[in-house]
C-alpha cells in the first residue's frame, strides 16, 4: 500500500489531533503518501482531499478539536454518494482510508468498504465511549475529567446555597461519562440509560436526607436517561428542595 487518506467524522473528540499526527508520521516513515480529507465524509464526497507531510502535523498534539475539521454528511447514507466518495479516492490512487470517529462514522466506513472495495481502518474517536472492542475511546477520559471539574465546582456552590444540582452530561445512549464522573465526583445519584430508576423514590430519599440535615445533593444525568426538566420538577415537588439544572455540552 503506497497511499492512504485520513478523515475525522461526526462529533470532534479530544485526542483526534494526536491520533492524526501519529497516523501521518507513522505512514510517512513507512514510505507511504498520506492525504487528509477535510470535513469528514462531506469532504470525501466533494473531493476536498490534500496531501500531507510531517510539517502538516507540527504542534497539534496538544490542541483540541481536529485540524482536518469534521461535518455531518446525511447524503452518505445513499449508495451512489458512497460510490462518488470511493471514486474520488481511486482517482488519486489512494488504497486505504483511516476513519477516526464514532459508531455512525464506522457504519459509513463499513458500507464504503463492502460496496466499493476500499480498505478501511477505524479508530474509535468519541467522548461517548459507546464502541465495542476497546476499553476507552479517544476523548472519553478528557470528557470525564471535564465533567468532574464541573461537578467539583458545582458542589461548592450547591452546598453554600443548600441546593440540589442536577448535572446533565453527554453520552447519547451510553451512560459511561455519567457513571465515571459521578463516581469520581462523589455524586449521590447517577442516572444512566442502561439501568432503570424510580425518580419518585430518589426524590423521597432526598427529602428524607434533607430532614436529617443533608441539604445538598448532586444528581448526574446521562443525556439518554431522561428529561432534565421533568426530573427537576418531580424532585422539587416531592423533596421540597431547590433544584438547579446544569447542562454540560460543547466544552
Feature roles, as predicted:
Residues 4-6, 60-72, 125-135, 160-162, ...:
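Gly-rich Lys/Arg/Thr-decorated short loops/hinges at beta-loop-alpha junctions or inter-strand turns
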Residues 21-30, 50-56, 111-121, 138-142, ...:
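A glycine- and small-aliphatic-rich helix-loop capping segment at beta-alpha/alpha-beta transitions
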Residues 9-12, 37-42, 72-73, 102-104, ...:
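Short, ordered loop/turn segments at secondary-structure junctions
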Residues 1-45:
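N-terminal phosphate-binding or glycine-rich loops at protein starts, especially the Walker A/P-loop
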Residues 99-101, 107, 111, 116, ...:
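Accessory alpha-helical/coil subdomains and C-terminal extensions
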Residues 3-10, 66-71, 95-99, 165-168, ...:
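Short glycine-rich or small-residue beta-strand-to-loop segments that form or flank ligand, phosphate
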Residues 44-99, 105, 138-145, 149:
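Glycine-rich oxoanion-binding loops at beta->alpha junctions
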Amino acid at each position: 500500500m503506497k497511499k492512504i487518506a485520513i478523515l475525522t467524522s461526526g462529533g470532534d473528540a479530544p485526542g483526534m489531533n494526536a491520533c492524526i499526527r501519529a497516523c501521518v508520521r507513522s505512514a510517512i516513515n513507512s514510505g507511504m503518501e498520506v492525504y487528509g480529507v477535510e470535513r469528514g465524509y462531506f469532504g470525501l464526497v466533494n473531493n476536498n482531499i490534500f496531501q500531507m507531510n510531517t510539517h502538516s502535523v507540527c504542534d497539534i498534539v496538544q490542541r483540541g478539536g481536529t485540524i482536518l475539521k469534521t461535518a455531518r454528511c446525511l447524503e452518505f447514507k445513499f449508495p451512489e454518494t458512497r460510490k462518488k466518495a470511493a471514486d474520488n479516492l481511486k482517482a488519486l490512487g489512494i488504497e486505504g482510508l483511516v476513519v477516526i470517529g464514532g459508531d455512525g462514522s464506522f457504519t459509513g466506513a463499513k458500507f464504503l468498504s463492502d460496496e466499493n472495495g476500499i480498505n478501511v481502518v477505524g479508530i474509535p474517536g468519541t467522548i461517548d465511549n459507546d464502541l465495542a472492542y476497546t476499553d476507552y475511546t479517544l476523548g472519553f477520559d478528557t470528557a470525564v475529567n471535564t465533567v468532574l471539574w464541573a461537578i467539583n465546582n458545582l458542589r461548592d456552590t450547591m452546598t453554600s446555597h443548600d441546593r440540589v444540582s442536577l448535572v446533565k452530561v453527554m453520552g447519547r445512549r451510553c451512560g459511561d461519562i455519567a457513571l465515571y464522573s459521578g463516581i469520581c465526583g462523589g455524586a449521590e445519584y447517577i442516572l444512566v440509560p442502561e439501568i432503570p430508576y424510580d425518580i419518585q423514590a430518589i426524590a423521597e430519599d432526598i427529602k428524607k436526607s434533607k430532614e436529617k440535615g443533608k441539604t445538598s445533593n448532586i444528581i448526574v444525568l446521562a443525556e439518554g436517561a431522561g428529561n432534565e426538566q421533568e426530573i427537576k420538577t418531580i424532585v422539587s415537588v416531592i423533596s421540597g428542595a431547590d433544584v438547579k439544572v446544569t447542562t454540560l455540552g460543547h466544552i
